[in-house]
Amino acid sequence: MRHTNRYLRTTVSAAVVGAAVFGFAGIAAAQEAPASVDDIIVTAQKREQSLQDVPIVVTTLSQEVLDGAGVQDIKDLQILTPGMTVTSTQSEASTTVRIRGAGTVGDNPGLESSVGVVIDGVYRSRNSVGFGDLGELSRIEVLKGPQGTLFGKNTSAGVINIITERPSFDPSVSAELTAGNYGAMGGSVSATGPLSDIIAGRIFVAHRERDGFYDVNVGDGPRTLTEDNTQDYWTGRGQLLILPSDEVSIRLIADYTKRDEFCCSAVQTRVGPTQAFIAALAAPNGPGQRPPVAGFGTVPFSRTAYSNRETPQEIEDMGLSAEATIDLPSLNATLTSQTSWRDWSFQQGMDLDYTGADILHRENDGSNGYGVDNLTQEFRLAGATDKFDWLVGLFATKEGVYRDDSYSYGADYNGFASFLLTATLPAAVGGPSPSRLGCFTNPQGFLVTAAAPNTPLCVVGAVAPSAAAPTFAAGKAYEDHYSQRSESVALFTNNTWRVTEAFDLNLGLRYTYDSKRLLGVQDNLGSNGAACGGALANQNPANRAPSAIPGTVNVGTPAAAVGLLCLPWSNPLYDNRRIQEKFSDTDISGTFKGSYRFNDAVMAYASYARGYKGAGYNMDRVQTGVTPDASLFFDAETVDSYELGVKTTLFNRSMLLNLTYFDQKFENFQLNTFLGTAFVVESIPELTSRGVDADMVWFTPVEGLMFQGGVTYTDAKYNDFTAADLSNPARFPALSLLPGARASFAPEWSLTGALAFDRSLGGGLRGGFNLSAKYSTDYNTGSDLLPYKDQEAFTVVNGRITIGSEDERWTIDVWGQNLLQEEYTQVGFAAPLQGTAFTNTTTPQANGTYYNIATDTATYNAYLGAPRTWGVTLKVKY
């Protein structure tokens, strides 16, 4: 059959990698174990190379390794990758990857990724669209440092390169069934084989579901579901491999995923003084949130969340791709075409105050969510001569990003706002009170007496709040719609010159043209904005109605009260506001590397790389004071990276030991931060990340025993900067802890280790185990570095025991993740409207910051890491 040699040529390396990297994590791995580390093949430079010949820091993980460590989605991948953190926040759509301390929170759809995700050659423009059950994997390669030359923009911190299993002409059918705690159930079915002499197919279908990781106190309702962070999704992937000749290969892929889950609640880690107001509004349906105690309060890892509104999320992801390769013997080259179309959409409902009181929420009615659709095309021509490996390429993409956003007032919003406005007033004059909002918005003005110049007269009791005073009507407050269209074209080349038998030089360049256009409509609904309008009018003496009450003075609504009444969702200046912005940009990025092979066992290299992350727009209501920002634009980010590395092969080529020093400087680092009312990208002038990566793989002399480990030391810090260095100096107080400080999500030390064992038990049986762990030193989980968001050092351990037949017909795995029940926080954040971390934003502290922990009144919440899970998996294959 004419396809045989061609097919073997394209699949042998994948099979070897599947068995080689990190060793005997499963039955199949044991039977295909390599003789040495030389057999570990990667495509980090878009051509097959031995891992030890590539002058890049690459962690390569096979399907067996991923199974052995209990990896089901890319979030779990971090247990095998030192120096990498993956977090989710408001939803599974808000997933962010960081490498060597570089990366940003993913809750802003206008913000593109720092770590690129590529699946079967197709670039995913947002981290969130690349996460889920990826089915049958050949391997995953994690490339550290900027990779823009070959992988394009938005890979300034690294790339996760995912390669799935190709169709096979050898027919097989496999199935898997899993059951575990938290009501986990799931299964998958896969089949591959020939459809004709030149066509092979593969299909994979999986469904997984699980109860929630959180218990929910529903407070005032209307929510009835008492659990959250559930799992429920279907996914499918179909492929065709067409080999019309020995020179031509075509691979077609179609995939579809649908998720229908409840996510993501958070728990209180520290409760501020507003808890008393929450409790009063939530009564008699519970405390509304965890009652306060000294310090941080009770341990939040009972996983009890408070949410009176439902948190449903629906994600739909689909795509098509076509990869065609044509061998050109006359040029000793290969032409590759990669075409893709993808459509991803997300909708959710959300309890925005994270309490049992009915204050603020997002409705699950189609008015909250976003979508991304894109079309990409890449052409590459790669070849080789005796002295040169060369590659030239063209990449083009068109992308649309759409966001719908709305807020709704709950029945308790008026009362809570009144509590906040009267919080400092003693009970003798009627405060704090849930029914005094009109004192601050009444058209007659803000009336006080000489005896009580800071107390509105209606709070004292002489005048009742006017019935005509505008307040906040329960129901939807606003609906905003954003549409961003972007186009990007790039020309690139990557070439290696073998100067001598031992010395290579590599030069890569990429020219990128980027353009984006943003259209938006911001619209308040009904009478929303009237309360703010009344407060603003009362500040103007010309607008204040004269008072007929003797002894009163009309002083206008205080600025602090106006700030609370004119938050972005209640500000009339957004009503019927139209947004239209556009930009175009060009950038030249590239890399220059030199490598020297001292002998067969030792290779050293030095490299420089420049990365580029595109500019964009904040798709949110962003204001300074009460004035909406005139532009939502934020600048592009660049990085210059230097590396010195050595790759060694030891002990008769049974051990791999690699060591790399890195020095990276990011300019205009795109920091996405939550300001309490909106997610905003602010460009930080400079972030440096320096440190060392070390990786080891060892096929031990003990039959069936293998060890893999990695260590990353990272010193990631912001440079010193002032308010004048920011695009909006008014944001400096909230970011004043950053200058000179360690970056968030950047542990100084990150260590991983995996021990795998597999061998014959006799009687036609094989058995083995896999134990993997990751240790991280302490780091901060918030973009503003507030101390209540600190995470202490922690260790996560996963394990798996496997028994099965020698011929792989069946295997049974007993597995556990987070076996030590380690309790840790993914992301910490300050609850909206519930106190403030920055009580003084006009006068800095002696240390130059605007933060004083003694005056911090904020309530803090956290999205927690997954608890201990365990289960059993049965696999069969024919």
Role assignments for model-derived ranges:
Residues G400-V401, Y407-N414, M706, K774-G782, ...:
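C-terminal beta-signal and adjacent terminal beta-strands/loops
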Residues N161, S168-D170, T178, T192-R290, ...:
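Periplasmic-side early beta-strands and strand-to-turn transitions of outer-membrane beta-barrels
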Residues M1-A69, K75-T81, D246, L320, ...:
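N-terminal Sec signal peptide and the immediately downstream disordered periplasmic leader
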Residues T95, E112-S114, R126, G135-K144, ...:
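Outer-membrane beta-barrel translocator/receptor signature
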Residues L241-S245, L381-A382, G393-T397, Y482-Q664:
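Structural signature of Gram-negative outer-membrane beta-barrels, strongest in the C-terminal barrel
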Residues R210, S321-T325, T334-L352, R597-D620, ...:
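Membrane-embedded beta-barrel scaffold of Gram-negative outer-membrane proteins
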Residues D389, E501-L505, S654-F666, S683-S783, ...:
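Gram-negative outer-membrane beta-barrel transporters
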Residues V37-D170, L644:
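Acidic, small-polar-rich N-terminal luminal/periplasmic segments of exported/outer-membrane proteins
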